[in-house]
């Protein structure tokens, strides 16, 4: 059993047992297959915490880990909102939200690309500012990135689920706290928890720090009603030891990472489970 499997199953059980239904409301989300309202059971403010002795990835089902990393590179390295660039990587998870111009509007990578931070008289974006400050001002309590821009929320195809990171350097270790306003536990959470841990490992490597703790905070923690049956099946499955994540140690520049610089070794997992998408 992995740390992630244990915490994940605990939260799923709590949601199914004690979650509050939103069926009394006219919800925004609709089922992609038939357009009917996609209702949820939810609880609020849950935290997952990892000591980084293992990579947090589920073993009770197959997680498309390469797809998760490609999405991460699209947002954090390319700082892109162009879905066609993601399609070129063979990833289509954002196709449902693609606008007429091929983008997701002013969401995710668009916010990271904005050069709105001052650094030695030059305007830089959030990622470059973070990398510089972690290396040159490690004791700062201001190592934060933010995707939630109130002035541009109406220009986003989808407002960001994971919206904030805060980084801490303590005794030579790089700790990461991630905040998600909302997490779909069947589909979004397994991706987000894994990919932001990969980001922590990438940035620790290029800034020269050891890995510290990884904390993932969720505001609205929910399960869609059509996902419950398969989640119950998933929780009963055999659990395996965590795999090892290899990241090419030769990469010293954040922008030099490619998908070929990552390998997930000895990833044993249950079969893939199908969960319908709510849009």
UniProtKB/Swiss-Prot annotation:
One of its GO terms (cellular component) is cytosol. Signal peptide: none annotated. The active site is at 161 (nucleophile). Its EC number is 2.1.1.45. The gene is thyA. It comes from Bacillus mojavensis. Pathway: Pyrimidine metabolism; dTTP biosynthesis. This is Thymidylate synthase. Coiled coil: none annotated. It catalyses: dUMP + (6R)-5,10-methylene-5,6,7,8-tetrahydrofolate = 7,8-dihydrofolate + dTMP.
